[in-house]
Amino acid sequence: MGNKQLQWCFKLKDGLRIAEPNERLSKLYLEQAKSSLLRAEKDLSDKDLLWATVAIYYSEYYALYSFLQRIGVKCENHSCSILATAFLTGEDKTKTINQHKGKRIDAQYYMKVDQEIKIRAMLQEAKIFVSDFDEFVSSLSEKDINLYRSRISKEKRN
Protein backbone atom coordinates (compact mmCIF):
# COMPACT_ATOMS: atom_id res chain seq x y z
CA MET A 1 0.00 0.00 0.00
CA GLY A 2 1.51 3.33 -1.04
CA ASN A 3 1.21 6.81 0.35
CA LYS A 4 -2.33 7.96 -0.59
CA GLN A 5 -1.50 11.67 -0.33
CA LEU A 6 1.48 11.32 -2.67
CA GLN A 7 -0.58 9.30 -5.11
CA TRP A 8 -3.16 12.10 -5.07
CA CYS A 9 -0.37 14.62 -5.75
CA PHE A 10 0.68 12.65 -8.83
CA LYS A 11 -2.89 12.91 -10.17
CA LEU A 12 -3.14 16.70 -9.82
CA LYS A 13 -2.81 18.77 -12.99
CA ASP A 14 0.18 20.71 -11.60
CA GLY A 15 1.13 18.07 -9.05
CA LEU A 16 4.13 15.78 -8.83
CA ARG A 17 5.92 14.82 -12.04
CA ILE A 18 9.06 12.78 -12.59
CA ALA A 19 11.52 14.64 -14.83
CA GLU A 20 15.24 14.64 -15.46
CA PRO A 21 17.43 15.76 -12.55
CA ASN A 22 18.45 19.38 -13.12
CA GLU A 23 21.56 20.50 -11.26
CA ARG A 24 21.55 23.95 -12.90
CA LEU A 25 17.98 24.73 -11.83
CA SER A 26 18.67 23.27 -8.41
CA LYS A 27 21.52 25.75 -7.93
CA LEU A 28 19.34 28.62 -9.16
CA TYR A 29 16.66 27.75 -6.61
CA LEU A 30 19.29 27.72 -3.84
CA GLU A 31 20.48 31.16 -4.99
CA GLN A 32 16.89 32.39 -4.93
CA ALA A 33 16.47 30.96 -1.42
CA LYS A 34 19.45 33.00 -0.21
CA SER A 35 18.20 36.09 -2.03
CA SER A 36 14.80 35.69 -0.37
CA LEU A 37 16.49 35.57 3.04
CA LEU A 38 18.12 38.93 2.26
CA ARG A 39 14.73 40.28 1.15
CA ALA A 40 13.19 39.07 4.43
CA GLU A 41 15.93 40.83 6.41
CA LYS A 42 15.29 44.07 4.54
CA ASP A 43 11.52 43.78 4.98
CA LEU A 44 12.03 43.14 8.68
CA SER A 45 14.32 46.15 9.07
CA ASP A 46 11.68 48.23 7.25
CA LYS A 47 9.06 46.89 9.72
CA ASP A 48 7.17 45.27 6.85
CA LEU A 49 6.24 42.20 8.85
CA LEU A 50 3.78 40.78 6.33
CA TRP A 51 6.28 40.64 3.47
CA ALA A 52 9.07 39.50 5.79
CA THR A 53 6.88 36.52 6.68
CA VAL A 54 6.19 35.78 3.01
CA ALA A 55 9.88 36.08 2.05
CA ILE A 56 10.90 33.80 4.93
CA TYR A 57 8.54 31.09 3.74
CA TYR A 58 9.64 31.41 0.12
CA SER A 59 13.32 31.21 1.08
CA GLU A 60 12.55 27.85 2.64
CA TYR A 61 10.37 26.72 -0.25
CA TYR A 62 13.06 27.54 -2.81
CA ALA A 63 15.64 25.61 -0.77
CA LEU A 64 13.31 22.62 -0.53
CA TYR A 65 12.46 22.84 -4.24
CA SER A 66 16.17 22.85 -5.10
CA PHE A 67 16.25 19.31 -3.69
CA LEU A 68 13.32 18.23 -5.85
CA GLN A 69 14.90 19.76 -8.96
CA ARG A 70 18.19 18.03 -8.17
CA ILE A 71 16.51 14.62 -8.08
CA GLY A 72 14.22 15.32 -11.04
CA VAL A 73 10.85 15.95 -9.43
CA LYS A 74 8.66 18.82 -10.59
CA CYS A 75 5.64 20.14 -8.75
CA GLU A 76 3.68 23.40 -8.77
CA ASN A 77 1.70 22.57 -5.65
CA HIS A 78 3.52 23.66 -2.49
CA SER A 79 1.77 21.17 -0.22
CA CYS A 80 2.70 18.31 -2.54
CA SER A 81 6.31 19.50 -2.83
CA ILE A 82 6.61 19.58 0.95
CA LEU A 83 4.86 16.21 1.27
CA ALA A 84 7.19 14.59 -1.29
CA THR A 85 10.26 15.97 0.46
CA ALA A 86 9.00 14.77 3.85
CA PHE A 87 8.32 11.33 2.37
CA LEU A 88 11.84 11.11 0.94
CA THR A 89 13.89 12.77 3.68
CA GLY A 90 11.79 12.43 6.83
CA GLU A 91 9.30 14.68 8.64
CA ASP A 92 12.05 16.42 10.64
CA LYS A 93 13.46 17.98 7.49
CA THR A 94 10.14 19.70 6.71
CA LYS A 95 8.91 20.62 10.20
CA THR A 96 10.08 24.26 9.97
CA ILE A 97 8.61 24.94 6.54
CA ASN A 98 5.30 23.39 7.55
CA GLN A 99 5.07 25.74 10.54
CA HIS A 100 6.08 28.76 8.48
CA LYS A 101 3.72 27.88 5.63
CA GLY A 102 0.77 28.39 7.98
CA LYS A 103 2.16 31.73 9.15
CA ARG A 104 2.68 32.84 5.53
CA ILE A 105 -0.92 31.94 4.66
CA ASP A 106 -2.23 33.78 7.73
CA ALA A 107 -0.18 36.87 6.87
CA GLN A 108 -0.84 36.93 3.14
CA TYR A 109 -4.50 35.98 3.05
CA TYR A 110 -5.91 36.89 6.46
CA MET A 111 -3.68 39.84 7.43
CA LYS A 112 -2.73 38.05 10.65
CA VAL A 113 0.91 38.90 11.25
CA ASP A 114 3.01 37.72 14.18
CA GLN A 115 4.90 40.06 16.47
CA GLU A 116 8.27 41.27 15.22
CA ILE A 117 10.17 39.19 17.77
CA LYS A 118 8.49 36.02 16.50
CA ILE A 119 9.26 36.90 12.90
CA ARG A 120 12.90 37.49 13.84
CA ALA A 121 12.93 33.97 15.33
CA MET A 122 11.35 32.64 12.11
CA LEU A 123 14.11 34.32 10.10
CA GLN A 124 16.79 32.60 12.19
CA GLU A 125 15.04 29.26 11.69
CA ALA A 126 14.83 29.95 7.95
CA LYS A 127 18.56 30.66 7.76
CA ILE A 128 19.26 27.28 9.36
CA PHE A 129 16.72 25.58 7.07
CA VAL A 130 18.26 27.07 3.90
CA SER A 131 21.80 26.29 5.06
CA ASP A 132 20.85 22.70 5.90
CA PHE A 133 19.23 22.17 2.50
CA ASP A 134 22.19 23.81 0.75
CA GLU A 135 24.57 21.34 2.42
CA PHE A 136 22.20 18.42 1.86
CA VAL A 137 21.62 19.10 -1.84
CA SER A 138 25.29 19.88 -2.49
CA SER A 139 26.33 16.55 -1.01
CA LEU A 140 23.93 14.36 -3.03
CA SER A 141 25.69 11.67 -5.05
CA GLU A 142 24.34 10.10 -8.22
CA LYS A 143 23.55 7.02 -6.15
CA ASP A 144 21.53 9.15 -3.68
CA ILE A 145 19.66 10.82 -6.53
CA ASN A 146 18.79 7.46 -8.09
CA LEU A 147 17.58 6.09 -4.74
CA TYR A 148 15.30 9.09 -4.16
CA ARG A 149 13.98 8.86 -7.74
CA SER A 150 13.27 5.18 -7.31
CA ARG A 151 11.39 5.72 -4.02
CA ILE A 152 9.18 8.50 -5.37
CA SER A 153 8.58 6.68 -8.68
CA LYS A 154 7.24 3.65 -6.78
CA GLU A 155 4.58 5.87 -5.21
CA LYS A 156 3.44 7.01 -8.64
CA ARG A 157 2.92 3.39 -9.69
CA ASN A 158 1.07 2.27 -6.54
Positions of PLM-derived features:
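Terminal alpha-helical segments
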Residues: 1-158
